[in-house]
Amino acid sequence: DSLGRVNLTWQINDTKMVYATWSEGYRPGGINRKGTLPPYTSDFLTNYELGWKTTWGNVFVFNGALFRQDWDDFQFSYLGQNGLTEIRNANSAQIDGLELDLSWAATYNLQLTGGFAWYDAKLTANYCGWIKPNGEPETVCPNGTVDPNGNVVSGPQAAEGTQLPITPQFKGSVNARYTWDMAGGEAYWQASLSHAGRRRVDMREAETA
């Protein structure tokens, strides 16, 4: 398989530009550490991104990007009953996001910066927990379905729309740095604050209820 990338850039002037990117990527498959578990396959990503980089009056920088990522055979992991990490494939997932970063030279000595991000990361198909004979993750498993091991399931382990693991819905940070001359060099003090929203460790609903 081949991967593609297309990038278009418009340099509005010396201090402002916008860009659009379409790109593809993948993560290789592999074998789980526990030999009785099935191997996991490669997953594939298609990324659509629109962004900008701007400077205003040599004192204010404002950059940002809007993006969508579509995942096929999405890889995710969780801690299994034996204490080993298990990697599985879900059918499909999507991440919509907005990322912003700002910098302001408030005075000659004081620099203020901040970064903010919002993500809507979710499954776009049910995750049932097993693979179909054609190698694709099963997505249809209503209450009463019998899985390949003969167990009757009560529904998908993670339903369409479930938040993806590890990815918070929001994160942000701010930083202030004050610099001054001292003893022929420079000294500074710096203060930072960061926050990240709630994150799921395990995507499966029974494990996070």
Regions found by a protein language model. Give the residues of each.
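Membrane-embedded beta-barrel scaffold of Gram-negative outer-membrane proteins
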Residues: 11-25, 42-105, 111-117, 121-127
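A structural motif corresponding to the C-terminal end of an alpha-helix
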Residues: 8-12, 176-178
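Extended hydrophobic-aromatic, low-complexity segments
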Residues: 19, 29-31, 60-63, 73-76, ...
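Outer-membrane beta-barrel proteins
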Residues: 37-42, 87-93, 163-164, 208-209
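Outer-membrane beta-barrel translocator domains and adjoining extracellular loop/strand segments
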Residues: 30-37, 74-81, 119, 124-131, ...
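Residues that define the transmembrane beta-barrel architecture of outer-membrane proteins
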Residues: 2, 44-48, 94-96, 168-172, ...
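Gram-negative outer-membrane beta-barrel transporters
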Residues: 68, 89-203
